[in-house]
Structures are given as structure tokens and as C-alpha cells.
């Protein structure tokens, strides 16, 4: 996803309030844990993109930020929502550097849920863990990890170790954790 970002002034409340009233989202771009720039993103463009994303996919989505003539690859590290309207009111981006590893949550997607043996026998499929915390280089980031539940029977479980993890991705979450279970109704 490509976003055009503009530089903004300081963190004064009055300035940030005006940015939001004009249809912008204040954001901070970090690099190596240090603040690189205060920027503004068009709220309509970001919200339109956000509405097309699958639940949980924002954590592993790589953005290309056009900032002052540079193309910066970044991940959303933090997102803040308005309490009542649930509008996005602030974003934090972390710049991705090719040779530096990054920690992130990659969503787990269950596949073949319709063909699951346990569900066909009247069971209920329950996904216990929805993300896997991993460490990888920016080039190895994947949008999601797949867990095939087709052969899962009644009262059976699949663990994180049952997920085929692509090369270059190192899990931080213990692999003996239960990811999916089929329970009797």
C-alpha cells in the first residue's frame, strides 16, 4: 500500500486538532526506535484502505510512504482510535531497514474450514491464537500464516508447530501453544 505523507509541525494540541478537522491523521515515523519525522496522512485514503483489509492484517502490511521525495517502507506499530466514533486519530510507523530484523505479529489464517472433519461431525471450530509473534527481515514478511484444519477431528487440537513457517521467519511465540481446537457442541 502506498501512502503520500506530508511533514507537519510540532505536537501542539491545537495544531493536531486542526489537522484532524481538515481530514488528516497525525502520525510519527520512527527509525531504529527514534522519532524520524512528524507527518500527516490523508484520513479518507487510509480509512478506505483499512476497510478493505482482513481482520488483523494491518500488523503485517508493509506500507510505502512517499515522504519528501523518498520512498520509505514501514509497518504500523501503533494505531489509536477515537473512543466513541472509532475513527483513526493517530498512527505510529516503524521504518523497515533491509538488513535489520523486525518483530511483528503475523495473523494466522485457518484454511479448509468448510472441509474440516470435526465440523462435519457437528463440532465447533475455535481459533485460540490469532497471531504469531515472529522476528524476520523485511524481505521475509508475509501477510499471513496458513494453518490447514481439514484433517482436524472432534476434540482434537492443532498447535503452532503445525503451521508451515516460511524460511527466514523465526517464531518468538512458543510453538507448543494450541492454535485451533474442534470442540463438541
UniProtKB/Swiss-Prot annotation:
Cysteine-cysteine disulfides: none
CDD domains documented for this protein: Ribosomal_L25_TL5_CTC
Subunit: Part of the 50S ribosomal subunit; part of the 5S rRNA/L5/L18/L25 subcomplex. Contacts the 5S rRNA. Binds to the 5S rRNA independently of L5 and L18.
Keyword Ribonucleoprotein: yes
Function as written in the Swiss-Prot or TrEMBL entry: This is one of the proteins that binds to the 5S RNA in the ribosome where it forms part of the central protuberance.
InterPro entries tied to this protein: Rbsml_bL25/Gln-tRNA_synth_N (IPR020056), Ribosomal_bL25/Gln-tRNA_synth (IPR011035), Ribosomal_bL25_b-dom (IPR020057), Ribosomal_bL25_C (IPR037121), Ribosomal_bL25_long (IPR001021), Ribosomal_L25_dom (IPR029751), Ribosomal_uL5_bac-type (IPR020930)
Similarity comment: family membership: Belongs to the bacterial ribosomal protein bL25 family. CTC subfamily.
Keyword Ribosomal protein: yes
Keywords annotated in UniProt: Ribonucleoprotein, Ribosomal protein, RNA-binding, rRNA-binding
Protein name (database record): Large ribosomal subunit protein bL25
GO cellular component terms listed in the entry, alphabetical order: cytosolic large ribosomal subunit
GO terms of biological process kind: translation
Molecular function as annotated in GO: 5S rRNA binding; structural constituent of ribosome
Amino acid at each position: 500500500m502506498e501512502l503520500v505523507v506530508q511533514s507537519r509541525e510540532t505536537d501542539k494540541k491545537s495544531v493536531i486538532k486542526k489537522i484532524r478537522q481538515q481530514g488528516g491523521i497525525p502520525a510519527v515515523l520512527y527509525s531504529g526506535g527514534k522519532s524520524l519525522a512528524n507527518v500527516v496522512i490523508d484520513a479518507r485514503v487510509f480509512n478506505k484502505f483499512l476497510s478493505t483489509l482482513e481482520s488483523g492484517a494491518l500488523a503485517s502490511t508493509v506500507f510505502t510512504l512517499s515522504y519528501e521525495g523518498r520512498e520509505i517502507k514501514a509497518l504500523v506499530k501503533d494505531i489509536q482510535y477515537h473512543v466513541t466514533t472509532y475513527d483513526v486519530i493517530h498512527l505510529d510507523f516503524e521504518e523497515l531497514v533491509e538488513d535489520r530484523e523486525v518483530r511483528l505479529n503475523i495473523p494466522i489464517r485457518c484454511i479448509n474450514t468448510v472441509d474440516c472433519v470435526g465440523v462435519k461431525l457437528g463440532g465447533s471450530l475455535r481459533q485460540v491464537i490469532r497471531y504469531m509473534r515472529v522476528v524476520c527481515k523485511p524481505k521475509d514478511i508475509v501477510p499471513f500464516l496458513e494453518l490447514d484444519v481439514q484433517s482436524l477431528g472432534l476434540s482434537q487440537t492443532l498447535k503452532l508447530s503445525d503451521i508451515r513457517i516460511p524460511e527466514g521467519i523465526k517464531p518468538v511465540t512458543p510453538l507448543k501453544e494450541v492454535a485451533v481446537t474442534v470442540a463438541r457442541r
